[in-house]
A protein has these predicted regions:
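Assembly/oligomerization scaffold segments
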Residues: 1-71, 205
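Short, surface-exposed ligand-recognition loops at beta-strand->loop->(often short) alpha-helix junctions
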Residues: 81-85, 182-185
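Short beta-strands and strand-coil junctions in structured, solvent-facing domains, enriched
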Residues: 22-24, 72, 101, 135-139, ...
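An acidic/polar, Gly/Ser/Thr-rich interaction patch typically located in mid-to-C-terminal regions
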Residues: 2-23, 149-212
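Glycine-rich, acidic and aromatic/proline-enriched surface loops and short helix-turn segments
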Residues: 87-103
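Short beta-strand-centered interaction patches in the first periplasmic/extracellular domains
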Residues: 61-71, 104-172
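Extracytoplasmic/secreted envelope proteins and their assembly/folding machinery
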Residues: 48, 88-92, 124-128, 187-191
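Second-shell loop/turn segments in exported
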Residues: 76-84, 112-117
Length: 212
């Protein structure tokens, strides 16, 4: 099971397996993990991240939980006072402290802040502090191992979903449309898709992707 949403700081995944594989698995927290899905020998990365806790095959657990790179940000503590900085400079520093370098940050120009103290906060909390200090409400998340702040992942193609072709079910729940389809590993949240259906048609933005 894989969960990815615009409204969540991090993506997560759970891998469940039968008892016959339990003794063969031994994983440590922060071991790297990748999940791939695809067709005809062509695979797409649908999740990249890390094991979120130690797993010993000798236990009775039959599930491994994973989190994306935000796990490293949650465990990185920022404790400093920053002078004459911009949001992008601060966020780049937080990422570097977590050992992360792949990022795409907004190119918008923001005024320099003379001083911003951050005391014993995780890197995630520190980013929220930066947003608050500049009065910003912008999304940030990881996708494909890249950190995005007020930016979206590149999309090379807008895929079409059509009733009777690749739409299994389409219903409206909680003010949003939920589309059920076959596995679509190439679709990420914040991507655009094209819908052809009697209930709703046109180009829409994906807010959440759940794979089971």
């Amino acid at each position: 099971e894989i969960y990815s949403s615009k409204s969540s700081y991090y993506d997560w995944a759970k891998i469940r397996f039968t008892s016959q594989f339990r003794p063969k698995l031994s994983l440590k927290k922060k071991d790297p993990a990748t999940i791939q899905l695809g067709y005809d020998g062509t695979l797409e990365d649908v999740f990249t991240g890390f094991v979120s806790g130690n797993y010993d095959g000798g236990t009775y657990a039959n599930e491994v939980a994973l989190k994306d790179e935000m796990l490293l940000m949650e465990e990185t503590i920022i404790n400093d006072t920053f002078l004459d900085t911009t949001p992008q400079e601060l966020i780049s520093y937080f990422l570097a402290q977590a050992g992360l370098s792949k990022m795409k940050l907004s190119s918008k120009t923001y005024p320099t802040r003379k001083m911003l103290p951050i005391r014993r906060q995780t890197a995630v909390q520190a980013i929220n502090a930066v947003n608050a200090a500049w009065g910003l409400r912008v999304p940030f998340f990881f996708s494909g191992g890249v950190f995005y702040w007020d930016e979206k992942p590149e999309q090379k193609k807008v895929y079409t979903f059509e009733r009777g072709v690749n739409i299994l079910n389409l219903r409206r729940a909680g003010g949003v449309w939920e589309l059920e389809t076959v596995s679509a590993p190439f679709i990420k949240h914040s991507h655009k898709i094209n819908l052809i259906h009697p209930q709703v048609s046109g180009e829409v933005e994906v807010s959440k992707v759940v794979s089971k």
